[in-house]
UniProtKB/Swiss-Prot annotation:
CDD domains per UniProt: trimeric_dUTPase
Taxonomic lineage: Bacteria, Pseudomonadati, Chlamydiota, Chlamydiia, Chlamydiales
Cysteine pairs bridged by disulfides in the record: none
Residues at the active site: E139 (proton donor/acceptor)
Function in brief: Catalyzes the deamination of dCTP to dUTP.
PANTHER family: DCTP DEAMINASE
GO MF annotation list: dCTP deaminase activity; nucleotide binding
Pathway the protein contributes to: Pyrimidine metabolism; dUMP biosynthesis; dUMP from dCTP (dUTP route): step 1/2
The entry's keywords: Hydrolase, Nucleotide metabolism, Nucleotide-binding
Subunit structure: Homotrimer.
GO BP terms: dUMP biosynthetic process; dUTP biosynthetic process; nucleobase-containing small molecule interconversion
Species for this entry: Chlamydia trachomatis serovar L2 (strain ATCC VR-902B / DSM 19102 / 434/Bu)
Known EC number: 3.5.4.13
Protein name, per record: dCTP deaminase
Amino acid sequence: MGIKEDNWIRKMAIEEGMIEPFADSQVKLHPETGEKLISYGLSSYGYDLRISREFKVFTNVYNSLVDPKCFTEDALISIVDDVCIIPPNSFALARSVEYFRIPRNVLTVCIGKSTYARCGLIVNVTPFEPEWEGYVTIEISNTTPLPAKVYANEGIAQVLFFEGDAACDVSYAERQGKYQKQQGITIPFV
């Protein structure tokens, strides 16, 4: 199983719709204002995805218990904005700007960008399995004792693509994976 390079990622994005919308290079400046951005787009051996303007931030307003088998949205506040302030020692969910369609013989691993990690923000995204498609739900933990800012429409994590030596017997789509074709921020369910 080998990691895939920029030429392969570009070809799959353009010809197969693997990533939509697709930025063909690293974007570091806002195209209209010239303002510095947390980079996104194609890199040497990966693709830096962006975070959308949709966020769900954890709150304790209703004194809720977080239970992955019986999750309630009472624990979350929905925000649509160009920035999201994550409270100290708290957590937010978001979604990617990009829609992904993963080929049958490919598995991805997604790693948070170092710019955020160096600020105490930990980004977690589970692997994109063979034939999974959808917008990516992104988990962001603020491990600091201070509020932390996340910028919408800028880079948040890097996706690495690994091609298997052979196609899998059963894909995520064939297993009818529960997060297949997710459109927005998807909360946990069993």
